[in-house]
């Protein structure tokens, strides 16, 4: 979340920055609540001061033998205490309203982020590789998978419903090989520590990375979600939409030593998304699933290092595509297409021959101190006493299913077989083709 000081001292400037991303900050409500907060805070402080001052009289009156006077002062203190408690309740109510607003306010875009309404106004930064030309009719990954008896959408629909898949044989092996290759690359060459994390998380964790309270409808929940459960009730949990959620929350309520930074972590997990706002979009194939695998990259850095870390992390995701020899382009998201907690995001879009277009395969974001403030994730500089908020970054390195789509379509041959990229062949037992 944003620093509350910005909403107190730079309200109009903050509203203008948020307007760049199409978010209308309720300035008047915040200003009214802030005035109420200040007024009640003054009353609370005055009541506390008065009570403390009067309390000193009790000892003096008792010492002089004036028990009646001392008793009268005690009654006065009791009345002041009741008034003080009532004002504190008022103050808590106003603060709760301010917190509720703050929790739904997105991050401020970095100055380098281009203005725009939606993904049509994202700006291309670079391209790598040249899309192949084919002397036969290109098939999409669904047809290729069904021809090779490797992608079974009908059985998945019977078992669960739409937007799921059963993978079989060498197609399932290819899916596994892709994830193994990515993990080996990121751990062996890019310096990430591999993690195995829970796939179910609690509400506090989802709040920390920004999914709650605003985006609960995008998740799958084990039970109706509540902020806390009593000891007698089962814990309400949610399936993770991305490994970013559990991995980033490892530093929640933690003060790190400066020497520990940067932290670089990676995890391969399934991801679960309801796709609540995607009805009718990408209904065919693996592009948009309720359950899909992803290798996630997370970095925790000092504030002054985070923008350089974004370039590094994005480069690590790009390296996967380059080694797989898949054509892609890199775009910087405009203000209207950025995620809720991001201050700057690059998308990597891979070439999908059957669609004759580039499709997102990775999104790499600098969250600045937005998540860290929600999580109270901090570090202490050498020689300093006061801790500071860390910066958090995350990115897909890559989405496994979409990488498989790109391989199936870009490496297809005229007879319907799929050539295996050279870097994956050792993970496939030396196979050069499937299908």
UniProtKB/Swiss-Prot annotation:
UniProt cross-references to SUPFAM superfamilies, sorted A to Z: Class II aaRS and biotin synthetases, tRNA-binding arm
Reactions catalysed according to its record: tRNA(Ser) + L-serine + ATP = L-seryl-tRNA(Ser) + AMP + diphosphate + H(+); tRNA(Sec) + L-serine + ATP = L-seryl-tRNA(Sec) + AMP + diphosphate + H(+)
Binding site for L-serine: 242-244, 296, 396
Major localisation: cytoplasm
Cellular location(s): Cytoplasm
PROSITE patterns per UniProt: AA_TRNA_LIGASE_II
One GO biological process term: selenocysteine biosynthetic process
One annotated GO molecular function: ATP binding
Lineage: superkingdom: Bacteria
Alphabetically ordered keywords of this record: Aminoacyl-tRNA synthetase, ATP-binding, Cytoplasm, Ligase, Nucleotide-binding, Protein biosynthesis
UniProt GO cellular component terms: cytoplasm
Enzyme nomenclature, EC number: 6.1.1.11
Binding site for ATP: 273-275, 360-363
CDD domains: SerRS_core
Pathway(s) where this gene product acts: Aminoacyl-tRNA biosynthesis; selenocysteinyl-tRNA(Sec) biosynthesis; L-seryl-tRNA(Sec) from L-serine and tRNA(Sec): step 1/1
Protein family according to the UniProt entry: Belongs to the class-II aminoacyl-tRNA synthetase family. Type-1 seryl-tRNA synthetase subfamily.
Entry's free-text remark on domains: Consists of two distinct domains, a catalytic core and a N-terminal extension that is involved in tRNA binding.
Cited function: Catalyzes the attachment of serine to tRNA(Ser). Is also able to aminoacylate tRNA(Sec) with serine, to form the misacylated tRNA L-seryl-tRNA(Sec), which will be further converted into selenocysteinyl-tRNA(Sec).
Subunit-structure text: Homodimer. The tRNA molecule binds across the dimer.
Protein name (database record): Serine--tRNA ligase
Organism: Vibrio cholerae serotype O1 (strain ATCC 39315 / El Tor Inaba N16961)
Organism phylogeny: Bacteria, Pseudomonadati, Pseudomonadota, Gammaproteobacteria, Vibrionales
